[in-house]
Amino acid sequence: MEGHGPQKSSPLARDLTRAFNGYHKQTVLLKKNLKETHAFFREMRQNYSNTCASSTLSSDSASLETSQFSCISFPSHEEEFLRNTVGAAPYILVLGQDCAARYQLLNCLLGERLLPLGPQAGHACHGGQGSTCKRRKLCFTHGKQTRLSLALPGQYELVHQLVANCGRWDTVPREDLEILDECEDPAHRQAELEITLHHPMLQEAKVMVVPCPSVQPIEEAIEDCTRSAIPIVLYAVNQDSLSSEQVADLWKVKEILSFPICFVRLPNLSEDSSEPGQRFEKDKSKLQKQLLSHGLLTCPMGNCSCGAPTQMPTPGAKPQSVLGENFERLHRILVPFTRQVLQNQQVEAASLLNGLHCRCLDLFINQAFDMQRDLQITPRRLEYTREKEGELFTSLMAIANRKQEEMKDMIVETLGSMKEQLLEDAANLEFTDIIVTTNGDPVTSKEIKSCIHQIQDLIVVRLNQAVANKLISSVDYLRESFVGTLERCLDSLEKSHIESSVHNITSNHLKQLLNAAYHVEVTFHSGSSVTRLFWEQIKQIIHRITFVNPPAITPEWKRKVAQDAIESLSAAKLARSICSQFRTRLNSSHEAFAASLRQLEERHTGRLERTEDLWLRVRKDHAPRLARLSLESRSLRDVLLHGKPKLGRELGRGQYGVVYLCDNWGGHYPCALKSVVPPDDKHWNDLALEFHYTRTLPKHERLVDLHGSVIDHTYAGGSSIAVLLIMERLHRDLYTGLKAGLSLQERLQIALDVVEGIRFLHNQGLLHRDIKLKNVLLDKQNRAKITDLGFCKPEAMMSGSIVGTPIHMAPELFTGKYDNSVDVYAFGILFWYLCAGSVKLPEAFEKCSSKDQLWNNVKKGARPERLPCFDEECWQLMEACWNGDPSQRPLLGIVEPSLQSMMVRLCCGSEQKSSSLEDSS
């Protein structure tokens, strides 16, 4: 066989070529997405390692900041799967019961009699007279010229004279296929026959025919298919059933490759051509039962008369082994089988990539929330700590100043109430370290002095306890209301800025100062050095008791000593001493606290500057880039599973795209298709983030479902790229509905539906930012759903851009600083239209000749006018919703029950009250 032109292809080969070609086109996109994902992760690691290296942060703080992005990477098992799958080459692996079956199937695949069959092939694989078939492994590859060569797998080509190279041939000579018995060269015996053909299918996939089992075990023969290849495993059956050895070999193949097998029942070449159909009908059930019984087939369904499977696989389902029983219509089962095997690998890779993108993107968004909260709450915490400590200090100083007179009276009162008990306790006091006789004989002066001190100590200790308890109760409420909150706030500030050990010592010292300053009552209870020092001054105030002769130690003497000691105490001096020490401690602790707080604030200022810089990078660069990769991987998965949607008639046009009818896609019917052509990277990124927010939302009956997306690289003849967003199709939009006329009950129900949808978005942390008539769609029952989440973003991801439709835009939108109350404002304007029952512009807006004039008027307070038909409660709700002060707008949790009560009152309670509103529509 010679020639330079491409060989003719059979219908089967052409269909397989198209399947392989489609696989390669999608592989290019998968490779690109994977490469860009790797580059993105690599850049993230480099950026944050450089940031931490150049920062003045300590190692602990740097590692903390870096750890926020440590999970922005491939898990090892996912990376290995993608490396082996993305870009893996399709490889047709031809197995069979014997060489004749394998060769017959190969000829069918290529559409020509390339390998010898029948008498040309020589003796069978298990021939008589003890002969054994020794046919080589065959590898078919693409080349401009047809040639045969012997080569060691993965090594080098052998210099060997082949019969095919000696002249013209149409069928590969049998001598080149076999290993001769007299051949003793091990390299020659192990070599495989490489057949290069200029065949279209071989441009897309290699083909391998396994050798006879006597030449090489099956597990060694298919080893090449385990590395960076997607094997399309075909098994040719030309006998009534499989032998036990063949079943065992098939199980080895399934264990090694983990891919499904397409069993192909071949007609027997020796049979009369008029009988095969009848013979197949008799044999196929036997073969099918055997394959099912051995677990080599899982689905008992066979083929219909056209040769196709009676049951088509579900999109995305794992491919299963199949049996093709009608050889003439083999393409009906082999082509879908091939497509499903190839598609399954790409769907798994795209799904894994998209899962990684979504996980990392959610991490970015969550961290944006955390960083935004940190930027907002840390300055407030510092200010709160400073204010509360100041209030506590002022309150305690006020107590110290005003309590002196109260404390004097308290001490006098305490002494008065305790005097008799103190005198009794003193009379019964048992002295320590002094031996007193029973009759109270006089002792030495030194012992007398010790006895007097012990009596004084008794009085001081009892008085200490009583006065301390009274003082504690007077400031106890301050400890509960100030110190606990201060400590919790301080603890959160410390945890948000974990730095070096020096900072830890400073923080711990700050806590100790707080405890020492404001938990004064602890020192009263404990017998600490502070207590001894504090009450030593009280003992000094007691006048010394003078005596000339040592007295007798009797209960009366003890009572007299105690009496003199109590009378010698000065309540005024005691009160003054207590308050003075209290003030001194307060001042020193207050100054130390203020100094430590200033130090902590300085450290937080530097950290917050870095956090704000990181927050900006996450919002403006990291998240949008990753969202685009996520959109691409998800769109690739969707097009692999469901194909490219067919565009129907145009339904409408908007600022950013065209909406078409789409009859059926991905099992959804009917659908609407929004075609968007992003003009630049910014619009690409915005669209990608919109898609991510919408796709990750749980399904909700008040939001239009987004079914999927497809990126069309052939849009406008390939001159631009369009993103096709496939979504639920509804009956009409609210603008059209109001023009056609809606009853009051329907309009109020629409208002309730819209509020329910907005509340759901807000609960998910999203702002819609473009609530208007055109973005509310109605079904056939006139129930509303919100659509077009093009401006929908989490609050933490907003950059302050001015977006929306001018009439529905809240005044603060023009400043770039706003929150979810902008949706409440927009609902107020929408509710005006619903109550009016028409689409006519309010007078205040109709007079404006330009957007700028409209914006200026809105900022100055221009709002829609009250129409005569408006109910008072409806008008009050509108006014509250479009209040110029965002903080004064009602929460949607209040708006919803208000609307429900209006609906009951106006639609169910009194037909007379609602008649004016009905007339307005």
Swiss-Prot record:
Catalytic site positions: D770
InterPro entries: Dual_SerThr-Tyr_Kinase, Kinase-like_dom_sf, Prot_kinase_dom, Protein_kinase_ATP_BS, Ser/Thr_kinase_AS
Residues spanning the membrane: none
Cellular compartments annotated: Cytoplasm; Cell membrane; Apical cell membrane; Basolateral cell membrane
Keywords from the named record: ATP-binding, Cell junction, Cell membrane, Cytoplasm, Developmental protein, Kinase, Membrane, Nucleotide-binding, Serine/threonine-protein kinase, Transferase, Tyrosine-protein kinase
A GO CC annotation given for this chain: basolateral plasma membrane
One protein family per Pfam: Pkinase
Name of protein: Dual serine/threonine and tyrosine protein kinase
Species: Takifugu rubripes
Gene this protein is translated from: dstyk
